Amino acid sequence: MIDERTIAQPKVTVYSTPTCPYCVMAKRYLAERGIKYDDVDVAADQSRALEMLTKTGQMGVPVLDIGGQVIIGFDRNAIDYALMNRK
């Protein structure tokens, strides 16, 4: 059986740093649900860090962009909501 959430999965980007424990938790949470994501290390890529700053107005991580819905911090409920109510 095909899971329609997989077919219609929104683009997911996780802005993170290697030393951030909440970033690790967020990425693990997505992986456990079979959600593919683009992992952006903002400590190593300043242009992507600026992109994150432009989207959020702040430099804290993790930041998740799920189909255009931005979530600051690791918030399971917000992640689930964004995945279920994708654009």
Sequence positions of predicted segments:
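Glycine-/small-residue-rich active-site loops that bind phosphorylated ligands and cofactors
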Residues: 21, 44, 71
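Short alpha-helical
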Residues: 21, 47, 78
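Major-groove DNA-recognition helix of helix-turn-helix-type DNA-binding domains
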Residues: 54-60
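A short, hydrophobic beta-strand/beta-hairpin element that forms part of a small beta-sheet core
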Residues: 62-72
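Thiol-/selenol-based redox modules, centered on thioredoxin-like
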Residues: 79-87
